[in-house]
Amino acid sequence: MAFQDNSLFPHYNVLENIKFGAERNKKKKGIEINDLIKFLHIDHVIDKFPHQISSGEAQRASLARSLLSNPDLLLLDEPLSNIDQSFKEEIQVKLKQILTEQKITTIIVTHDSYEAFYLGTKCGIILDGQLKQYDDPYNVYHFPNSIEVVNFLNRGILIPAKV
């Protein structure tokens, strides 16, 4: 699990926090720790403690810890919300690759519709505690089933009408 608040252990440095994930699932072969550290652009902070790094770096360290555990099911709550735009897209591409290659079933909670549509194979729109639409991302985006979903996606829709 990776949460928006990062949930890093304050008494561990970044590297120790990430390695904690590896201890959770030694039986499954997963991604290498050095590859994760490089692709998440946190190699320059591995010796620092959580209070010494930015929120984006902490979020990436938390994501690395979660991925390193190579789980069967992964819950991500706003996993990229604090990440700088300069490498957010690169991380999305690599994250999708890892989740696909490692066959990790992932539930992603996000307000970023691009992120949901890019990373997801299924997409659910929940408004006011109710599931309004659940489908593949293409259908949710191109064929929203209600005005509520259209408004949530922040895009206009042309409706043929006679005046």
Name the predicted role of every residue range.
Residues 100, 110-163:
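Internal alpha/beta loop-helix hairpins
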Residues 15-23, 30, 47:
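Short helical segment in ABC ATPase nucleotide-binding domains corresponding to the A-loop/adjacent helical element
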Residues 68-72:
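A short, proline-enriched helix->beta-strand linker immediately N-terminal to the Walker B motif
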Residues 28-45, 97, 103:
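Conserved ABC ATPase "signature" region
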Residues 74-78:
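Catalytic Walker B motif of ABC-type/P-loop ATPase nucleotide-binding domains
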Residues 49-53, 57-59:
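Conserved ABC ATPase signature
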Residues 63:
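Hydrophobic anchor residue at the start of the ABC signature
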